Amino acid sequence: MSPQPHIPVLLAEVIAALAPRNDGVYLDGTFGAGGYSRAILAASACRVWAIDRDPTAVARGKLLEEGSAGRFSMIEGRFGDMDSLLRQQGVNQVDGIALDIGVSSMQIDQPERGFSFAKDGPLDMRMETKGPSAADMVNDTPETELANIIYRYGEERLSRRVAKAIVEARRLKRFERTGELAEVVRKVVPRSGDGIDPATRTFQALRIAVNDELGELERGLEAAERLLAPGGHLAVVTFHSLEDRVVKSFLKARSGEAARPSRHVPQAQGSGPAASFALLSRKAIGPAPDEARANPRARSAKLRAAARTAAPAWETVS
């Protein structure tokens, strides 16, 4: 029996936000298991491109490409480079972009990838095979810097305590396994009443730092602004407050909302670049109760969507 296909979070809401049309060109910037790509292809007779930096996801995408009759193409790379990657393929504009930020459930479910504290595996956490791993970061980062990483990216109030415990443990033996790290963290972070594992925030922080996820998200949003055609839609799904804050801040600024003390006060003329996006919804969209019950990962998901205006993309400082 073949396995059940992976259904991404907020799938119906993302497709509704993109509103694919038959002659459109669309980008799935975080292919993963391909759920968004397949849904976009099924929604209209359109052309779909996809990007992923995970070699496993790229191989999965190549299989879909082979049976797509020329409607789907897979590109290996980072979504933060989406505009340059598509230009290399002769594509200068797209009509919609979907982004599902962070680690996928399929990556977490593979112990050998080192993302999970629930399943022992090598302490890796890299979405691609190059660059320093989580083990390198845990074993070699000075205590103060490690505490700052855990606090900033994991929002862990006990970050100093965790960093101290890690440094003391690594003096005896370098960390190599996810289980070793999780055990050390659980000894110094008490279990909360919400049932969340004490190691959750530390693992999140390391994963974000190893993969530069927030920097990649910022670059991806700016690239999407350059790549979207006027009237094109951007749909971004996030899973924790740090990601959502980046998306919310970007879209509020680019839509002119950030410059207003109140939505009832008109935008001041000449106060900055023209709005490059118009919000499709003032508030983030969350999962329906049925989806939240069926998929625990969906509970924290938020979708923010906006339409590209005809205004030029804002200048960015690299």
UniProtKB/Swiss-Prot annotation:
Its main location: cytoplasm. One of its GO terms (cellular component) is cytoplasm. Signal peptide: none annotated. Gene3D superfamilies: Putative methyltransferase TM0872, insert domain (1.10.150.170), Vaccinia Virus protein VP39 (3.40.50.150). GO terms for biological process: rRNA base methylation. Keywords: Cytoplasm, Methyltransferase, rRNA processing, S-adenosyl-L-methionine, Transferase. It is found in: Cytoplasm. Transmembrane segments: none annotated. It catalyses: cytidine(1402) in 16S rRNA + S-adenosyl-L-methionine = N(4)-methylcytidine(1402) in 16S rRNA + S-adenosyl-L-homocysteine + H(+). HAMAP family: 16SrRNA_methyltr_H. This is Ribosomal RNA small subunit methyltransferase H. It comes from Paramagnetospirillum magneticum (strain ATCC 700264 / AMB-1) (Magnetospirillum magneticum).
